[in-house]
Amino acid sequence: MNSAKLIDHTLLKPESTRTQIDQIIDEAKAYNFKSVCVNPTHVKYAAERLADSGVLVCTVIGFPLGASTTATKAFETEDAIQNGADEIDMVINIGALKDGRFDDVQQDIEAVVKAAKGHTVKVIIETVLLDHDEIVKASELTKAAGADFVKTSTGFAGGGATAEDVKLMKDTVGADVEVKASGGVRNLEDFNKMVEAGATRIGASAGVQIMQGLEADSDY
């Protein structure tokens, strides 16, 4: 297993500077990570710097609340892809899920999948805000909507991935949909737990530390 190719090297803090973006790009090239995951404002720059490197550009949509309208999420997706994004990590309408408005949740995801035009879509369900049954339902809706991954967390809601949630999500979606674990994956031990639970992608700012087997000091 090439551990580096499971990692989306992530920097989503609102105060991220161009210098910090340069650093994660350089690290992603050095370690040959799967992608860098950055906010939409940095996508075009990252895509230019990563051209022909083999490292993909991932960005976030409706982030971190998931509470923007479906049309807004679809436009954000189209704009991101136009700017060079390869992969889209969207946040579901969490309130709609909790209301039981499952059609709204699924249609929201479907609109992003359609706007992504074949690009990989990962669906953040924010597990820390959900109970067991809601995690199952959100995972089912992600699969039904045609997305490629179901993802645990934004890292902005006070909690991140757990191996238990990753396993539950993987058991729910089966072989057709992959699972991304993100939020609080800070070292090689955390990384291995998530992979053993069924994750095939890891979102972390600690990619370098994971590869070096070191503890990181960041929550995302």
Swiss-Prot record:
Its EC number is 4.1.2.4. GO terms for cellular component: cytoplasm. The active site is at D89, K151, K180. Pfam families: DeoC. Gene3D superfamilies: Aldolase class I (3.20.20.70). It comes from the Bacteria. GO terms for biological process: 2-deoxyribose 1-phosphate catabolic process; carbohydrate catabolic process; deoxyribonucleotide catabolic process. The keyword Lyase applies. GO terms for molecular function: deoxyribose-phosphate aldolase activity. Belongs to the DeoC/FbaB aldolase family. DeoC type 1 subfamily. This is Deoxyribose-phosphate aldolase 2. It comes from Staphylococcus aureus (strain MRSA252). The lineage of its organism: Bacteria, Bacillati, Bacillota, Bacilli, Bacillales. The gene is deoC2.
